Regions:
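Positively charged n-region of N-terminal signal peptides that target proteins for export
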Residues: 1-4
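Juxtamembrane interface at the cytosolic side of transmembrane helices
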Residues: 497-512
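Bacterial N-terminal signal peptides
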Residues: 6-16
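Short sequence/structural segments immediately N-terminal
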Residues: 20-501
């Protein structure tokens, strides 16, 4: 390397010849030496792809690279390969090249494995949070907030920083309570935060302090409780709307489950009734109708943990607040239930409204068999225990189930008939219009079950029953039309046949 550099400085070797004309003229000879370096086997340290990327850099970025090499912030070809291997867009590359902290800590010849930023931390035995790819995608880095914002010091200086005074003492690595206050220095300051995102709230710390997580961490000093980096990460913090963010909707269950699905972490924590806090929530959620929608089908409208429990003020919904959580999405069901007789009964027994019938984390898709009044049926089992003197309830539940069953059966029958009529070339649009009305009425009827009122339910079901009648009438008309077409076709074929016979006989007569 030294011999090559000497030749370059002496002008004995043309720079372009060393890199296939991919290194622009004017590049500092020291930088060229790194770009063209070879390992002991003679293989180029900087791959062609990274050389091509270097050649695409604008003058400003090449000058910053020249300066980094001249100041010996970038000292080796391996170090340069790491920087170029990121292949960042110009804005991010400029931020990186002006951050001596990140540059120095990505030098494998200077840093220990524990302190080395690299493109593959596991390969170097470094912690996962030392991934340089995460650093350059971090929301703080992209906003121009450098390492010094948390660690202290001056990122434009090579050394001489004062982060030792600003960064918490080593013993704080065993006490995580300081982290929330540390992050709150900025995130609780509206004036500071509004420079970057005016819509971002600044009350996270205030909410966290009073939450079960906050009380466990700050009052009980139990480090098993999560703090900011438990959910958001360390150097790879991304906006919640970024699919790679740990708090992106589809990743929230995994993030919460890191603690709540770990028996060791959750050992000793109890519910309000004194029972142990379960660790089955994540598995139950994944199998639930909500989990399948969010994780299976990618429906971001489906709720994750934080939609029901909250974020920084996360807490288990109490009996009185469960319905309010559910009503954020299921507003019609909640409104109907509030006006029903069941509302008072649930209040009297101190039952959580929605979860009493549907469950919480293991919510399965609601089905009509839930209305069964026999043994094992949801309605039947509850009413046998709590409403033995109300036989009209059983009659109402049976009516609900029978009516919905008849409409559902009619829907399936009409779909099959409609497809057969379409295959015969008949116009089925009027029938399908009534099918749409029936489908809407069926959905509405299932919602109106939550009124637990026969009269209210009948109002929702009536349009569906009428749609069945109208559709059946149109089906009969279509069948009659098809029969008429068949008769007409047969008559036409017969007429044509007779005509052909007559012509044949006439031709025979003429031949004679």
């Amino acid at each position: 390397m030294k011999a090559l550099l000497s030749l370059l400085l002496a002008g004995s070797l043309p720079i372009a010849a060393l890199a296939g004309a991919k290194i622009p003229a004017g590049t500092d000879p020291k930088l060229v030496a790194l770009l063209t370096a070879r390992d002991e086997s003679g293989k180029a340290v900087i791959p062609e792809e990274e050389l091509t990327y270097f050649a695409s850099l604008n003058d400003r970025l090449r000058e910053l690279l020249n300066q980094a090499v001249q100041k010996e912030v970038i000292t080796s070809a391996a170090h340069l390969r790491t920087v170029l291997g990121l292949q960042l867009r110009p804005q991010k590359m400029e931020l990186l090249l002006q951050n001596n902290c990140a540059l120095c800590h990505s030098d494998p010849e200077v840093q220990s494995a524990e302190d080395l930023f690299s493109l593959n931390p596991a390969a170097h035995g470094a912690p996962s949070h030392m991934n340089l790819k995460d650093v350059v995608e971090d929301v703080h880095f992209r906003s121009g907030l450098s390492c010094a914002g948390c660690h202290g010091g001056d990122p434009t200086a090579a050394l001489g920083h004062n982060f030792v005074k600003e960064w918490p003492e080593k013993e704080r690595g065993r006490n995580r309570a300081w982290i929330v206050g540390f992050c709150a220095r900025c995130h609780s300051d509206p004036t500071f935060m509004h420079q970057f995102n005016p819509a971002l709230p600044t009350d996270q710390f205030a909410k966290f302090k009073d939450s079960p997580h906050g009380v466990t961490l700050l009052v009980r000093h139990d480090d098993r409780a999560p703090q900011c980096i438990s959910c958001h990460g360390v150097h790879g913090i991304r906006p919640a709307k970024d699919p790679q963010s740990r708090v992106y909707p589809q990743r929230v269950p995994e993030t919460c489950g890191a603690c709540h699905a770990n028996p060791k972490t959750m050992a000793g924590f109890t519910q309000p009734d004194g029972s142990s806090l379960p660790t089955t929530q994540l598995a139950e959620y994944k199998a639930s109708v909500h989990g399948q929608a969010l994780l299976g089908r990618g429906d971001l409208g489906a709720p994750a943990c934080n939609d029901c429990h909250g974020n920084h003020a996360a807490s288990p919904p109490g009996v009185a607040s469960v319905s309010h959580s559910c009503s954020l999405c299921h507003s019609a069901n909640a409104s109907l239930f509030d006006g029903s007789k069941h509302k008072q009964a649930f209040d009297d027994h101190n039952w959580a409204e929605c979860s009493k019938c549907h469950g919480n984390h293991a919510i399965s898709k609601a089905h009509d068999s839930m209305l069964a009044t026999g043994p094992g049926g949801l309605c039947g089992d509850c009413h046998r225990q709590y409403a033995k003197d109300h036989p009209e309830c059983v009659m109402t539940a049976n009516y609900f189930r029978d009516t919905i069953g008849q409409m559902d059966q009619a829907k399936g029958r009409l779909i099959t008939v409609s497809e057969k009529l379409a295959a015969k070339g008949l116009d089925i649009e009027p029938i399908n219009n009534h099918l749409t009305e029936l489908t809407d009425a069926l959905k509405r009827s299932r919602t109106y079950i939550h009124s637990f009122s026969r009269n209210t339910f009948e109002q929702a079901a009536a349009p569906g029953e009428e749609a069945i009648k109208q559709a059946d009438t149109l089906v009969e008309k279509a069948r009659s039309e098809y029969k008429f077409r068949q008769i007409g076709l047969a008559a036409s074929i017969a007429s044509i046949g007779l005509l052909m016979i007559a012509i044949y006989l006439k031709l025979r007569q003429l031949e004679k």
